[in-house]
Amino acid sequence: MKIERAYTIVTAPGRNFVTLKIVTDEGTYGIGDATLNGREMAVVAYLEEHVIPALIGRDPQRIEDIWHYLYRGAYWRRGPVTMSAIGAVDMALWDIKAKVAGMPLYQLLGGKSRERVMVYGHATGKDIEACLDEVARHVEEGYRAVRVQAGVPGIASIYGVAKKPGERYEPADAELPAEHVWNTAKYLNHAPKLFAAVRERFGDDLHVLHDVHHRLTPIEAARLGKEVEPFNLFWLEDCVPAENQESFGLIRQHTTTPLAVGEVFNSLYDAKALIENQWIDYIRAPLTHAGGITHVRRLADLAGLYHVRTGFHGPTDLSPVCLGAAIHFDTWVPNFGIQEYMPHEAVTDEVFPHDYRFEDGHFLVGETPGHGVDIDEEKARKYPYRRASLPVNRLEDGTLWHW
C-alpha cells in the first residue's frame, strides 16, 4: 500500500476549517484536521509546499517513521504551523490504519479504559445572572461539568462571553484583529463573586471550570487561586502566559486550586517541566496542534507518571475531525480527566458527518472503522474560506496585553 495523493480542503461552514485528505493506491483514505484558528492558510501553504509532495509513494502504515520524517527531517522543528501540519498527517494515517484493520481507532490504541467520556460545556453571560441561566440550561441538558465566564462591570469585552444569550462564542469575528481593553483589578474583584453565585444556586456536585486566558501575572494568579479555594473549582485554566513555566511553581506554592494549561502547546517539550515538577494538574494540548495522536500519546504517558490528567482543548475552531479523534483517544488514555465540548453548528456537522454521540454529559465513542468522521467535499465547496482574526488586548493606558 502506498500514498497515491493527498490534498487540502478549506471550507467555512460556520467558521474556517482545514482538512487534509490522504488517499492510498488501494482506495482507502484518511482525513486529519489541520485547522489553526486565524492562521489557517499558513498551515495550508506548509502542507502543500513542504509536506504533501514528500508523502507521495510512502507506506501510510509506517506512521511512526513518517512522523519522525516530518518532524526531524524538517530541521525547523515545532511551532504551531509545523505541528498542526504534522498533526493532520498523523490523524489521517491513523484513520487509514484503523480502516485497514477494520477497527475503530480506540481499539488500535489499546482498547477502552472507560465506557464514556465526560465533557464540560461553556456557560456565558453578560452578567452573573445571565451566566447562571446558561449554567441551568447546561445542567438540564445533562452536563456534569460547566465552564463559567461572565461579563465584568466596567470591561466592555470579556473572553469567553457570547454576544447574545444562547449564541456560540466566536472570538475570530473580524477580518483584522479587533482591539479589546482589559482591566485586571476589575476582573480579580469580580471573578470570585461569579463562583460564589454558581455554588449558591447549583450546590457542590457540579464541576465548575474557569478560563483566565493568560491574563494574570504569577502573583495575581496565586492570589486568585487562593481566594477561590472555597468554591472547589475543577480547574483554573491558563491563569498566566504559558511561556513562563516557572511561574506555575510560584502559583502552586500558594494554592490548592487545580491548574490546567496547554491549549497553545504544540510539543511535549512545552509541557515537560510543568509535568515533571507537578506544577499542573491537567494538560490541554489538542491532537491537531500538538503533532497528532503519535506525539500526544507520548505527552499523555509522561503526564500519567506524575498524576497529571488530560483535559483536551475542544472549541469549535477545531473541526469534528479533531474532536472525533480526541474522543477515541479519551476513551483509551488511562489518565483521562475531561474533554472540552462546544457544539458545532448544524451546518458544520452536515459537512463533517460523524458517529460520536453526546448523551447525558458524556461522549459515546463510535464503532466505525477509523476515527469515525468524514467530510462531504461537495457540501464543503459551498462554503468558501473567509479571513477571520483573533482579537488583541490592551490595558486601559494603551499597553498591549495578553489576549
Swiss-Prot record:
The active site is at 159 (proton donor/acceptor), 213 (proton donor/acceptor). SUPFAM superfamilies: Enolase C-terminal domain-like (SSF51604), Enolase N-terminal domain-like (SSF54826). Substrate binds at residues 37, 122, 263, 284, 313, 317, 340. Mg(2+) binds at residues 211, 237, 263. One of its GO terms (molecular function) is mannonate dehydratase activity. The record marks 315 as: Important for activity and substrate specificity. SMART domains: MR_MLE. It holds the Pfam family MR_MLE_N. The keyword Metal-binding applies. Keywords: Lyase, Magnesium, Metal-binding. GO terms for biological process: amino acid catabolic process; carbohydrate catabolic process. Its cofactor is Mg(2+). It catalyses: D-mannonate = 2-dehydro-3-deoxy-D-gluconate + H2O; D-gluconate = 2-dehydro-3-deoxy-D-gluconate + H2O. Its EC number is 4.2.1.-, 4.2.1.39, 4.2.1.8. The keyword Magnesium applies. Binds 1 Mg(2+) ion per subunit. Has low dehydratase activity with D-mannonate and D-gluconate, suggesting that these are not physiological substrates and that it has no significant role in the in vivo degradation of these compounds. Has no detectable activity with a panel of 70 other acid sugars (in vitro). Belongs to the mandelate racemase/muconate lactonizing enzyme family. GalD subfamily. NCBIfam families: ManoateDhtManD, PRK15072.1. This is D-galactonate dehydratase family member RspA. It comes from Halomonas elongata (strain ATCC 33173 / DSM 2581 / NBRC 15536 / NCIMB 2198 / 1H9). The gene is rspA.
